[in-house]
Swiss-Prot record:
GO biological process terms, semicolon-separated: translational termination
InterPro entries registered for this protein in UniProt: Ribosome_recyc_fac, Ribosome_recyc_fac_dom, RRF_sf
Disulfide bonding pattern of the chain: none
Identification of the protein by name: Ribosome-recycling factor
NCBIfam families: frr
Swiss-Prot/TrEMBL keywords: Cytoplasm, Protein biosynthesis
Keyword check for Zinc: no
Broad class of where this protein is predominantly found: cytoplasm
Family: Belongs to the RRF family.
Keyword Protein biosynthesis: yes
GO cellular component annotations of the record: cytoplasm
Record gene name: frr
Amino acid sequence: MNVRDVAQRTEPKMKKTIEAFQHEIASIRTGKATTALLDRVKVEAYGQQMPLKQVGNVGVMDVHTLMVQVWDKSMVSATERAIRDANLGLNPAADGQSIRVSIPPLTEERRKEFVKLTKKFGEDSKVSLRNLRRDMIHEIEKLEKEKAISEDDKNKGKKEADEMLHKFEKQLNDLIVLKEKEIMEV
């Protein structure tokens, strides 16, 4: 095992952290209709909590409206209730076997709350990235103690860990700035 092996094991984990962050912020409202808004909604169905995607299809009708096509007609009211109770500030209205979800414009105060939430998710992701870097450095130091690599290799490995961290933190910061712009856009 060498420094390259450690780096090759760490990089995919850092990529996964970025992907998890992207998934997390996709559900934050920006004032535009997007199916990701309802990703976290759980519906009480058949005696258990099920993701909305498992009880119906979600589609975008227009910029301010989502349409949820519920597969089982008996689940329409439970689905409508789940969307209303999800604390997303959305206004669902049953229409036969489907539900129209109106997305009201965001207030300035609500936009700022969503920006704060985005930054919080970003900070959590940065902590994860730093922990991965720390683990990588720890593994490299362990290799040096076991005499599997030289001190020069250890130093190069630490430098590579720092560079990898900076690369992924930059990606994360770019995503945060992009999401903030999206949220604050009126």
